A protein has these predicted regions:
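N-terminal Rossmann-like dinucleotide-binding module
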Residues: 2-44
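Donor/substrate-binding cores of folate-linked one-carbon enzymes
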Residues: 25-29, 90-209
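Short amphipathic alpha-helix with an adjacent loop that forms part of the alpha/beta core around
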Residues: 76-86
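N-terminal beta-loop-helix "entrance" segment that forms/cooperates
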Residues: 39-56
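PAPS-dependent sulfotransferase catalytic core
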Residues: 206-228
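An anion-binding loop in the catalytic cleft
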Residues: 222-289
């Protein structure tokens, strides 16, 4: 029954594409995809479709099927009418990057499943993966929950813990791992959700923590701090490695030396000492140190 239920998938970036790919591999094919519009990317500003759109376009082309793709700039009345016409049983949301209003959440018959790459109620918000790395956590995880009008707030259907070594694992690797686990948890949860036999648990608001969206400025590391870490200041070395790992690839870690910007692409700690591995000076290609 669960595989026959109609659902719409909301998601835009790489994390969402990995989740969606896992769902498709598990036999859960969305009726439609909702993602952000195509955007100009890179120095040449080439208009590029989001990763989820690319995935669905490739799937539709190779499987002779037609998954509708909706890319609203705003979740307005016209978009809501399009969704209602699809008559979905439920929604799945993974890193959609827009606040979804009640008027949209009220459309599906069964409600909306959200997936969030943290152990809710910890690390709610825009940057859970970056934030756990920056904080030096040793455990993180992923959560499947019932979405409501508040951010990452609804009752929890399932969670899975994932051990974490922030001195080894960078953002890209952790994102991949958590997205794959999220897809697996969704595949386990959806049948129970559709059949009405899931047992969600209320989040403990007293334990809620929140994350923020990071900018380029958050990735700046004073060169004096870098120098001290290379000289053996282990506390500074660990923080710098965590910063590089958290902001790989975006917004990136960087420093300024002699008035020139240097991107810090890869580093590690050895015996409490910072070892830079890969850097990139402005106007040059990346190189090993």
């Amino acid at each position: 029954m669960a595989n026959n239920a109609k659902f719409v998938f909301f998601g835009t970036p790489r994390f969402a594409a990995i989740v969606l790919d896992g769902l498709i591999a598990g036999g859960f094919i969305p009726t439609a995809l909702v993602c952000n519009p195509d955007r100009p990317l890179g120095r040449k500003k080439i208009v590029t479709p989001p990763p989820t759109k690319q995935l669905i376009a490739e799937y539709s082309a190779t499987h002779a099927t037609d998954v509708a793709i909706l890319q609203p700039e705003k979740l307005d009345d016209a978009f809501i009418a399009q969704l209602r016409a699809l008559r979905p049983d439920f929604f799945v949301v993974a890193a959609y990057a827009k606040i979804i209003p009640n008027a949209v959440l009220a459309i599906p018959r069964l409600g909306t499943l959200g997936t969030h790459p943290s152990l809710l109620p910890l690390y709610r918000g825009a940057s859970p993966i970056q934030s756990v790395i920056l904080a030096g956590e040793t455990v993180t995880g992923t959560t499947i929950y019932r979405m409501d009008e508040k951010m990452d707030h609804g009752d929890i259907f399932a969670q899975e813990k994932v051990p974490l070594d922030v001195l080894i694992t960078n953002y890209s690797a952790l994102e991949m791992q958590l997205a794959k686990r999220s897809a697996w948890l969704l595949i386990k949860t959806i049948p129970l959700f559709v059949d009405g036999i899931a047992s969600p648990q209320v989040q403990d608001e007293s334990h809620a923590t929140f994350t923020k969206k990071f900018t380029t400025e958050n990735g700046f590391i004073e060169y004096s701090e870098l120098d001290a870490a290379i000289a053996g200041a282990s506390d500074k070395a660990e923080l710098i490695v965590r910063t590089i790992h958290a902001f790989d690839p975006e917004p990136g870690a960087w420093t300024i030396k002699d008035g020139k910007r240097i991107k810090l692409l890869e580093a590690r700690m050895a015996d409490g000492v910072l070892k830079l591995i890969t850097i990139q000076r402005d106007g040059e290609t990346a190189r090993n140190v």
